[in-house]
Amino acid sequence: MERRKFEALVVRAIDNLPAEFQRKLENVDIVVEEWPTRGQLGRAKHIHPTQLLGLYQGVPQTKRGRGYGLVLPDKISIFQKPIEAQCRFGDEIEAKVGEVVRHEIAHHFGLDDETLRKIESEKRKRK
């Protein structure tokens, strides 16, 4: 998929967030990268680049204290090639991008992977 089209999917995923979450995104850049770097793989404890679809790097909002300020923005990286490697068709890519964007934004709001797994498990039970 062309980079421009993939970036548009990321923008659409952000635009599809509920307004209250969009308003609360503070001091965070969301970027598209082709592949994760070795450093990013190490931080995320992944051994293969196709396993890491997105990465949040920063200080979650729940950890920001009174002294938080004058800092570089948090960074959410969405990795295009690993997502494409896991999906066959454009609509699968779009769905996966939305899932990854929501997951990484949840980290920005302070949710850890264990909590996110529990939430996803509860969603599946309700279906």
Q: Model-derived features: where do they sit?
A:
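Active-site rim/adjacent substrate-binding subdomains
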Residues: 1-96, 108-118, 123-126
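Catalytic glutamate of the conserved HExxH
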Residues: 100, 104-108
